[in-house]
């Protein structure tokens, strides 16, 4: 396999076209902690760092704030108007569950059908309304349908007034 073929295989969609949709939910900040107790520490930190804003700014947190969660988080950023975040970083426990490369890829690159079916609207609402998201269910990836996901999605501003970043965290007991 030459370099071009290897690159194309790494960048190909990973979704299983026969997989069932995931469950996507959104919560108001004041509802999230009670609804998602396994993520209470992250939600408390997020709520604390909001200050008077609806959504905290990424500059108001430090990576060390997530110390016990490092292995379980993915970081992503919205680039432009489309609510299709590009993944920047994945912790080793998340990578172990997913078993495919996420860094530098968008949701629509990894799962184009599910992006259109669920995630465009889901991330649009999180981004527009500062909601906290949850994605759960069986991983809809080829050969990974046995793996369970339960991923919290926390929105962050990035120096402005709009949501530009997400911190995704896989539940520790699901990893």
Where do the language-model regions lie?
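Sensory/regulatory domains in signal-transduction proteins
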Residues: 2-14, 22-175
